[in-house]
Amino acid sequence: MELSQLEQRLEVLEGRVAFQEVTIEELNQTVVAHQRDISRLQEQLRLLSDKLREQNTSIIASQSEETPPPHY
């Protein structure tokens, strides 16, 4: 192979590597953003679950809080 052909091939490979580096960085930023979203959604789910659990326990009265039936 001639030197000019090798230089052309090298330039093509360098261009591909540069493109891949940009793509990898963009993908990394996307993954980081998704992880932030997942963490935020997990926290919201935890808060909603806690709130629902609190509401369920407050709806059901304990035996001592129940008024006796009318025939007592």
Swiss-Prot record:
Pfam families: SlyX. Disulfide bonds: none annotated. InterPro entries: SlyX. It comes from the Bacteria. Belongs to the SlyX family. PANTHER family: PROTEIN SLYX. This is Protein SlyX. The gene is slyX.
